[in-house]
Every structure is written in structure tokens, then in C-alpha cells.
């Protein structure tokens, strides 16, 4: 722990500083980002021995165990007689990884490593976040979820079913860790843009929490992935003999709501009222109402609504430095009116209000197109969210017509309709404005509204492009090269989570997501903008997440949202002291000796 924080930084000891969870860092060391070179590993006492050590991914070091550790832990002979540093272990993994032909095979290798040696897994991820993020999360995680029956190797996370209702507290007691600080939960009904994958959706919470640690430094032993299995309406899965979930239609209504209510209460009863619960990939009908139902009662947020909103608004704020005007000068057309679209729209309204625009005027700057066309006043069966953005305008059937009529400065695709941004739409956008904003945010890549290459080619390099999934750099005929910005939620949720955990925040207001968007936009340099980037390089994401966490923590104390007191004087030092390190611990016994005269053997 950082000495500058001292004893009594809190009224009670910080919960969950498990052995091996802290980086070897001191506040007096020179600032070197999130990855200052660690000092010697301190000995960590273990009660486990033998196979209980080598088969525990939190403890296993493979051939990095020293001879002394092997002898003391009773594992000598259970490991080959070879001694490797973590650097060499990383090299072995990388060489094997590079031999794989498919991304799915690479995903399986990494997940198998996570099940075997957790520290090495995170050493691999943090060695090149930009390289490995598309494998452990979008777009490859979508493919892994579709084939989860084949890729499933070892249970990771907690599977809770509708038939366990009334016994969720008992099920949570089955989890081996008691000091959980973050839960990511899904019911598998709307996995990315792939639809209802039921129990196969567990790949999403597992992947998200891997990024909590790799990008945000949250201790993985304090994270819990949860799949709520209430059935699936995917007939293909119901017929599949390899499907690992409940084989019946989805349960809705009161029984579903009762399960969610019990789950939320059981989590907070077990892990505390400030345990963070992130909702992920719930269907639109449930996502909004559950967010509104729980947001002021529990420490929770919905990443598809609020996380996506934050990263999208961050990209828009960065784009303003290219268009050289204010947010209030822009008009937005959305392809899609689901969770992501509504989340972005609401945060845009908040940003416009902060700029001084009245709310009614701000909503008129946002036009939404769903499967039935432009959302207009008087249209039947509009839900509350859509009514807020319904325009006083005659009905318009297609996105192309809406773009032609409205002449927006920005189009944002979040409907998972591949190719929705046609060449005609892109040409129109380029004719209306010198620097049109074009965000194709749908995941995975196969569902993107347009490719980066198509956007830059049709707009002759004038389009300001961002996507939800990664695209390679694009070089036009004139030799100009663009590096597309990826609006990945991983810029948001790891840093927000670290800040929320650090402050013991009990409720997460939308202001935190606007603050996060502003911080991400500030991280983009002029050089990045000249390359077409609207987001900082993924290689810097751990440092970005750290600064977001510090901002969140500072905001929490200023607005009386934090529950841990006294307030840390040096918030950066405090947050850094919580960051997980993949460096191995030492498991040798604490050995020392007494003065010789004190050990004289008494005789008769």
C-alpha cells in the first residue's frame, strides 16, 4: 500500500485487499502510468498444497514456481524440472497463439489460459491490449457465444436459472469468493447484434470482466460473471443436443421480474449495497424498465444504454474539434431506436443542456428511424422512450428519405443492419456538409452499417468515421491514410467501475457517463484527429481508465455519492493502490533467524 495514504485512510479497513491483489507501488516512485516496474514480490502465506495450488488459476504459476516454492508447497515433481520467468512464459504463449489460423481458436487458447494461470492471462492481455481485445471481446466473443457449446471447457461464472427462484442466496454462497465488488449479468436475450443466444450468452459477462481487469485494473477475484437462464426462444438452440442451457421458451412477466428482484437483493445482501452490478445484453423491453427500476436503489448501470452513450458522445465531442463548431450546431439522425440509440440520445440532450440549449430544443435536434420509419408524433404504439424523440413531421418510410429531408450533420447507426448506410446516403451526407459525422456503431463487424473503407472512399476522405468494431487503416488513391476510430465501450466501463469501486458509490447518475465522455474526448490529441482517430489508441487504455477512475472518484466526493470516508487526500495515489498487477507473488515461507545466544539449547 502507498505509504502516503497512511493508516486510517478509511473508517474501516478497505474491504477485499486480498493477498496478491495490490501492485508493488509507492507514492514516492516516479509516475510511469499504470505499469510502473514492480519491486521484489512479497511472500504470501498459503494454506493450500499440492494439486490444490497447481489447479487453482489464482495461484498457479506453472514453471515459474521456484524450487523452494515447489518443495514447500508439495508440488515438486508435479511440474517439469524447468524454471521459467513470466517473460519466457509470455513468449511461449505468443508463439503458440500466432500458429492458430482462426480467431475462434485464438479465443479458446486465451480462455484456457485464464482457467489455468490467471496472472499470466492478464500479463498476455496487457502486453498488447490493442491486439487481444478483438479476441477476448468484440468481434470474436460473438462468434464464441454462437459456438459456446463447442468452446465450453470449464465453468466460469455463476449460472442461475428460473427454477432456482427462492434460493438465490444459497446459490451465491456457492461462489468461492466472498469479497465481490463487481458483477456483470445477462439473460442472453440480445447478445450483441446476434439475438437470443440463451445460456451461450455467458461469454459476454466473462469477456466484459476480463476487460475490467485488463483495461481498468480491477482485481479479477473481486469480479463475478452471472448468466440468468430463463430459457430461450431460439429454436435452433432448443433443437441442438450440445446446447448447455434450459430447453424451453423464455419465461416473461411476474416470474421473470421476481427472479430479477431476488437476484438484486441477494447480491447486495451477500456482497454489500455498493457492489457494482452491470447489466449487459438484455432485450430492449427489459433493459430500459430494469434500469429505471433499479438505478436509484442499487449500484448498477446498463452498459448497452449508458456505456454505449458515453463512448459515442465522447466521439462526437472529439469530432467537434474537426468540424470547428459547437454541439448545438449539429443535427443527428439515428438508424435504430433501441437501447443504444436512446442511451446516446439522452446523453446528447444532457450535453446540449450543459451547453445552454433548452431540453425541448435539444430533443428536436435528434431524429430517429426504426423498423417502421421516422418516429413521429401520433404514431401508434410508441413507448415512453420513443415518444420523447418523436418529431412533429409527416411519416417518412426510409433512412435515405430522412437523410435527404433533414440534412443532418451526423448519422449514427445502432440497429445492427449491415449496409444500412448506402452509398447514396454517404454521398448525400458529403454533399450537405464539408465534414459529415458518420458513426457505424453496430456490433459485430458483420452487422456494421458501413465499412471504414466505404465511408472514406465515398466521402473522398471528408467523412468523420467511427465504428463499434475494429476496422483496419484505409489508404485512399491520393495517398492519404486514415486510422478509423473504434467507439468501444471498453473506453468507458473499466474506468467507471474502478472509480465506483474506489469510492464505494451506491448509485451511478448519468452525469458520471457525461463526465467520462468528456475525459475520453480530452485524451484525443490533434495528431490523432489528423489521422481520423476520434478515440485515444487502445494501447493507452489502461492510463485512460485510470484517469477516468480518478475523475469519477473526485466527482463522487464532491457530490456526496461516495460512502468511504475520510476522503483520500491524494486520489491518484489511492486509485493506483487498488490497481491489480499480473506480477507473480512469492509463496515461500517467511523465513528468518534469532540471535545465536537466544537459541541456546537448555540442558539438565
Curated annotation (Swiss-Prot):
Catalytic residues as annotated in Swiss-Prot or TrEMBL = 137 (proton donor), 208 (proton acceptor)
Q: In its keyword annotation, does this UniProt entry include Cell division?
A: no
Catalysed reaction(s) here are: (S)-malate + NADP(+) = pyruvate + CO2 + NADPH; oxaloacetate + H(+) = pyruvate + CO2
What's an example GO BP annotation here?
pyruvate metabolic process
Provide the binding site for a divalent metal cation. Answer: 280-281, 304
The record's principal subcellular location, in a coarse class, is: mitochondrion
Keyword Metal-binding: yes or no? yes
Task: Write down the NCBIfam families for this protein, in alphabetical order.
Answer: PRK13529.1
For the modification Phosphoserine, which residues carry it? 371
Cofactor(s) it depends on: Mg(2+); Mn(2+)
Q: In which tissues is it expressed?
A: Expressed predominantly in organs with a low-division rate.
Q: Which PROSITE patterns match?
A: MALIC_ENZYMES
Site, Important for activity: residue positions: 304
This protein's name:
NADP-dependent malic enzyme, mitochondrial
Enzyme Commission numbers on file? 1.1.1.40
Say which species the protein is native to: Homo sapiens
Q: Where does NAD(+) bind?
A: 190, 304, 443
Question: Please, which domain of life does this record's source organism belong to?
Answer: Eukaryota
Disulfide-bonded cysteines:
none
Instruction: Give the family this protein belongs to, as stated in its UniProt record.
Output: Belongs to the malic enzymes family.
User: What are its GO cellular component terms?
Assistant: mitochondrial matrix; mitochondrion
As for subcellular location, the record says: Mitochondrion matrix
Q: Where are the transmembrane segments?
A: none
Amino acid at each position: 500500500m502507498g505509504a502516503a495514504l497512511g493508516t486510517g485512510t478509511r473508517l474501516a479497513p478497505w474491504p477485499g485487499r486480498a493477498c496478491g491483489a495490490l501492485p508493488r507501488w509507492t507514492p514516492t516512485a516516479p509516475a510511469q502510468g499504470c505499469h510502473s516496474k514492480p519491486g521484489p514480490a512479497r511472500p504470501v502465506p498459503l494454506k493450500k498444497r499440492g494439486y490444490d495450488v497447481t489447479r487453482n488459476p489464482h495461484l498457479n504459476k506453472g514453471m515459474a514456481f521456484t524450487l523452494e516454492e515447489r518443495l514447500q508447497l508439495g508440488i515438486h515433481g508435479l511440474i517439469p524440472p524447468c524454471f521459467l520467468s513470466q517473460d519466457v512464459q509470455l513468449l511461449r504463449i505468443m508463439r503458440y497463439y500466432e500458429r492458430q489460423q482462426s480467431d475462434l481458436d485464438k479465443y479458446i487458447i486465451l480462455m484456457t489460459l485464464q482457467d489455468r494461470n490467471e496472472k499470466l492471462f492478464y500479463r498476455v492481455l496487457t502486453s498488447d491490449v490493442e491486439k487481444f481485445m478483438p479476441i477476448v471481446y468484440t468481434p470474436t466473443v460473438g462468434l464464441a457465444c454462437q459456438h459456446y457449446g463447442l468452446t465450453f471447457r470449464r465453468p466460469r461464472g455463476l449460472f442461475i436459472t428460473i427454477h432456482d427462484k427462492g434460493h438465490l442466496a444459497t446459490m451465491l454462497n456457492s461462489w468461492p469468493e466472498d469479497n465481490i465488488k463487481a458483477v456483470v449479468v445477462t439473460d442472453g436475450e440480445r447478445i450483441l447484434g446476434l439475438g437470443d443466444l440463451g445460456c451461450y450468452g455467458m461469454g459476454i459477462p466473462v469477456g466484459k470482466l476480463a476487460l475490467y481487469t485488463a483495461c481498468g485494473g480491477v482485481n479479477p477475484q473481486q469480479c463475478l460473471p452471472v448468466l440468468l437462464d430463463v430459457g430461450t426462444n431460439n429454436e435452433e438452440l432448443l433443437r441442438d443436443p450440445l446446447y448447455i442451457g434450459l430447453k424451453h421458451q423464455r419465461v416473461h412477466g411476474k416470474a421473470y421480474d421476481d427472479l430479477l428482484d431476488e437476484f438484486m437483493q441477494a447480491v447486495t445482501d451477500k456482497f454489500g449495497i455498493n457492489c457494482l452490478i452491470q447489466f449487459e445484453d438484455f432485450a430492449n423491453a427489459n433493459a430500459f424498465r430494469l434500469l429505471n427500476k433499479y438505478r436509484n436503489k442499487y449500484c448498477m448501470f446498463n452498459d448497452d444504454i449508458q456505456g454505449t452513450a458515453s463512448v459515442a458522445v465522447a466521439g462526437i465531442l472529439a469530432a467537434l474539434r474537426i468540424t470547428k463548431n459547437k454541439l448545438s450546431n449539429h443535427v443527428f439522425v439515428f438508424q435504430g431506436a433501441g437501447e443504444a440509440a436512446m442511451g446516446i440520445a439522452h446523453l446528447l440532450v444532457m450535453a446540449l443542456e450543459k451547453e445552454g440549449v433548452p431540453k425541448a430544443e435539444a430533443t428536436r435536434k435528434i431524429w430517429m428511424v426504426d423498423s417502421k420509419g421516422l418516429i413521429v408524433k401520433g404514431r401508434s404504439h410508441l413507448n415512453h422512450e420513443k415518444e420523447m424523440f418523436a418529431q412533429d413531421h409527416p411519416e417518412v418510410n426510409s433512412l435515405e428519405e430522412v437523410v435527404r429531408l433533414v440534412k443532418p450533420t451526423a448519422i449514427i447507426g445502432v440497429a445492427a443492419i449491415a449496409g444500412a448506410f448506402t452509398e447514396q446516403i454517404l454521398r448525400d451526407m458529403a454533399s450537405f456538409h464539408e465534414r459529415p459525422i458518420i458513426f457505424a456503431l453496430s456490433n459485430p463487424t458483420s452487422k456494421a452499417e458501413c465499412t471504414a473503407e466505404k465511408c472514406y472512399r465515398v466521402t473522398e476522405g471528408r467523412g468523420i468515421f467511427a465504428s463499434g468494431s475494429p476496422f483496419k487503416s484505409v489508404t485512399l488513391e491520393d495517398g492519404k491514410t486514415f486510422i478509423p476510430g473504434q467507439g468501444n465501450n471498453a473506453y468507458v466501463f473499466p474506468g467507471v467501475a474502478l472509480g465506483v469501486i474506489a469510492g464505494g458509490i451506491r448509485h451511478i447518475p448519468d452525469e458520471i457517463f457525461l463526465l467520462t465522455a468528456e475525459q475520453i474526448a480530452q485524451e484525443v490529441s490533434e495528431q490523432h484527429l489528423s489521422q481520423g482517430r476520434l478515440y485515444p489508441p487502445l494501447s493507452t487504455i489502461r492510463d485512460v481508465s485510470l484517469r477516468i477512475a480518478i475523475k469519477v472518484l473526485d466527482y463522487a466526493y464532491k457530490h456526496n455519492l461516495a460512502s468511504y470516508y475520510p476522503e483520500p487526500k491524494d486520489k491518484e495515489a489511492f486509485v493506483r493502490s487498488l490497481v491489480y498487477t499480473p506480477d507473480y507473488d512469492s509463496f515461500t515461507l517467511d523465513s528468518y533467524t534469532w540471535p545465536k545466544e537466544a537459541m541456546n539449547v537448555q540442558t539438565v
